[in-house]
Amino acid sequence: PYSKLFIKNLSSKTKIHSSLKIKMPKQLIFKNYSNELFREKYDLIVIALSLSGIDFIGKELKKFKIKSPILILTKGLKYEKNSKTILTLSQQLLKKNNKLNISVLKGPCLAKELARKNQTSVIVANKNIKTAKYIGKIISTKYYLIEFSKDVVGVEINSAIKNIYSMIIGSGQSLNRSSSLFQKSILEMK
């Protein structure tokens, strides 16, 4: 579910991110996936896969007792045909392993904007607010501002539907129309 060449480039001495064209911080450690990875203790495990990769990582996480907090960057919802329910990504992973300490991070946040160190605000949600704040301490900077919530499911659902509203707003013919759609979207999310 990932590019080995991409990880190799990130793991090299130069640590260049091929699509963002930036040098990554030396503190970040990038490793190819193996079962051995989850036997180690980390400050934080970050899951930044495509939506289709969540099933894969869920099956892998099921095999281990993981003590490190996990932060999901991926957005989306999954419809389960058998039970006719919609699951958030945290629910999907917890269904595989209910002992995981899962947090979610949601934007709006474009990687290129963040890489340019443009002011960005996101929210980290975990049912235990202390865990969310612990993660915030690790990842926040003067330009990357973090807010916190205990409502993991609410944050995930709003993040997923935000993209739908964004596309609708972007299709507006004028600023007045776009502003009106934006206001309506915010009211519906409350």
Q: Where are the regions a protein language model picked out?
A:
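NAD(P)-binding Rossmann-fold cofactor-contacting core
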Residues: 1-22
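Short, charged/polar "capping" segments at the starts of alpha-helices
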Residues: 3-9, 79-82, 132
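A general structural signal for well-ordered alpha-helical segments in protein cores
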Residues: 7, 54, 86-90, 132, ...
